[in-house]
């Protein structure tokens, strides 16, 4: 089966179980509230399982979006899932010209790895419009 990137609009019980493995520190109610607020949640699916996900807050009128909680399950890292998740998320929102991920979103012990990953995705480390440091494309 092929890896696909889906924009989730409703969470079924399987999605909730899988997102619990992606974001074990978060509660399903928070994901539902994120969606109900009109925000986007993209997930990488393989063999009917979610392997990674990212939340997106997009302001289409300004052509601007921020990425939140970008994560791939540890057991499936370094296999291209994250890169495909980012590339296809950007492709699915063509009205967005500026993409950002704040460094504060990433635990300090993972920043070096995330820096290499985000640069591989075409992002640069810089000062963001919010004034904090992070990656922008």
Task: Go through the PLM ranges and name each one.
Residues 1-29, 129:
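Short amphipathic alpha-helix that is part of the acyltransferase structural core
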Residues 20-47:
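Active-site rim helix/loop that mediates acceptor-substrate recognition in acyltransferases
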Residues 43, 49-58, 64-66, 71:
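Conserved beta-strand in the GNAT
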Residues 72, 78-91:
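Conserved acetyl-CoA-binding loop-helix of GNAT-fold acetyltransferases
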Residues 77, 112-113:
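Acidic/histidine-enriched, beta-strand-rich ligand/metal-binding domains
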Residues 93-107:
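Conserved GNAT acetyl-CoA-binding A-motif
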Residues 102-106, 115, 119-137:
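Conserved catalytic-core motifs of GNAT/GCN5-like acyltransferases
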């Amino acid at each position: 089966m092929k890896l696909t990137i889906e924009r989730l609009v409703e969470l079924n019980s399987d999605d909730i179980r899988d997102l619990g493995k992606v974001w074990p520190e978060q509660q399903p109610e928070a994901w539902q509230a994120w969606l109900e607020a009109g925000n986007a949640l993209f997930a990488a699916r393989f063999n009917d399982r979610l392997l990674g996900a990212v939340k997106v807050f997009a302001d289409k009128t300004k052509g601007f979006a921020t990425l939140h909680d970008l994560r791939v399950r540890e057991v499936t890292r370094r296999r291209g899932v994250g890169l495909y998740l980012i590339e296809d998320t950007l492709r699915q929102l063509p009205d967005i010209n500026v993409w950002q991920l704040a460094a504060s979103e990433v635990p300090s012990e993972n920043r070096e790895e995330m820096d290499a990953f985000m640069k591989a995705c075409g992002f640069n480390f810089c000062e963001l419009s919010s004034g904090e440091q992070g990656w922008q494309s």
